[in-house]
Amino acid sequence: PFQSRLLTVYCARGGMRSKSVTRFLSSEGFRVQQLEGGYKAYRRHVLDFLKDFRPPLIVLHGRTGVGKTLLIRSLPGSIDLENLAQHRSSIFGAVHLQPRNQKNFEGLFFSKTSSKPRKEFIFVEGESRKVGKVFIPEAFADAMKKGKKILLKASMETRVRRILEEYHPRDEETLFKIEAILPALKESLGKNVVEQLKTLLQQNKFEDFITILDRKSVV
């Protein structure tokens, strides 16, 4: 229940609007605090932090399905960038997810990293600077380039199985979304391959569908 949690109330600049709401909620028995300076001050604080956040990193690389994300989620002191962005950083990366905007991503990134010791190694998955529609902070992206790198490998069979588990169409709507993405691949794969992929998808031959995409380095 909300009354047992500490709530933070804010407005643009931390003025009377949030102050009035804070007082009202407090009088109703809620544990509540007002964000000093409001959202604008918070955003400045977040951006100032991200501008200089360059921790030592261990960066995991490897093809889709080798288990990078599984390993990241099992390691203490790791940052799951794809989870923060709610995007898997591929053309099908938004399937089953709700991608976040830049401000939300930066806020979550700040919450995840601001309490970490600056000299402590952090595990992270190798990404381009853009994950879906959001950009990794420039300083952190620079730290990723300079970090220690580990290459993970797995058999084709294992990778296809893992990709299938993560991207498997769970309903007609998801199937439609995946099919709607295929025309964007015509330039890189050619019309014939895209038509083949569309047929495999419609026939529920998902392993064959993923195998072709994997061989073409699309997923």
Predicted regions located by residue number:
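Glycine-rich phosphate-binding P-loop
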Residues: 17, 56-76
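A short glycine-rich beta-strand->turn/loop micro-motif centered on a GG-aromatic cluster
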Residues: 28-43, 83
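Activity-critical C-terminal alpha-helical subdomain
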Residues: 156-187, 191, 195, 199
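Conserved small/polar residues in nucleotide/adenosyl-binding loops
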Residues: 216-218
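Conserved phosphate-donor/acceptor-positioning beta-strand/loop module used by diverse small-molecule
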Residues: 125, 143-165
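Conserved nucleotide-sensing/catalytic segment adjacent to the nucleotide-binding pocket
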Residues: 76-143
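Helix-loop module immediately N-terminal to the HCX5R catalytic loop
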Residues: 1-6, 44-47, 174, 181
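Catalytic cysteine-centered active loop of the rhodanese-like fold, especially the PTP/DSP P-loop
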Residues: 2-35
